[in-house]
């Protein structure tokens, strides 16, 4: 009998960008950092896509929402 290989489709674990770069405070004025976690349509990327921890995702969400209210980031992008 021929042997079959198992496994194969192993996905690489996503790394928390904020923790990896030792960012302690997520500033709402740092739009370059915040844009990494926003989709092309202007939506906040979920944890399963961005790889952030739950704590950093909450901080990120608050910072993005503040930046939107202050006019630094758009609520939605136009096509």
Curated annotation (Swiss-Prot):
SUPFAM superfamilies referenced in this protein's UniProt entry, alphabetically: Ribosomal protein S18 (SSF46911)
Keywords: Ribonucleoprotein, Ribosomal protein, RNA-binding, rRNA-binding
UniProt protein name: Small ribosomal subunit protein bS18
Gene Ontology terms, MF aspect: small ribosomal subunit rRNA binding; structural constituent of ribosome
Pfam families membership: Ribosomal_S18
KW Transcription regulation (keyword) present: no
Oligomeric form and interacting partners: Part of the 30S ribosomal subunit. Forms a tight heterodimer with protein bS6.
Region forming the signal peptide: none
Function of the protein: Binds as a heterodimer with protein bS6 to the central domain of the 16S rRNA, where it helps stabilize the platform of the 30S subunit.
RNA-binding is among the record's keywords: yes
Cellular component GO terms held in the UniProt record: cytosolic small ribosomal subunit
Organism: Latilactobacillus sakei subsp. sakei (strain 23K) (Lactobacillus sakei subsp. sakei)
InterPro entries, alphabetized: Ribosomal_bS18, Ribosomal_bS18_CS, Ribosomal_bS18_sf
GO biological process: translation
Homology family: Belongs to the bacterial ribosomal protein bS18 family.
């Amino acid at each position: 009998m021929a042997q079959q290989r198992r496994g194969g489709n192993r996905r690489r674990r996503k790394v928390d960008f904020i923790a990896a770069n030792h960012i302690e405070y997520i500033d709402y004025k740092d739009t370059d950092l915040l844009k990494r976690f926003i989709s092309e349509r202007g939506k906040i990327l979920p944890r399963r896509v961005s790889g952030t921890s739950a704590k950093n995702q909450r901080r990120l969400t608050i910072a993005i929402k503040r930046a939107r209210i202050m006019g630094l980031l758009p609520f939605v992008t136009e096509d």
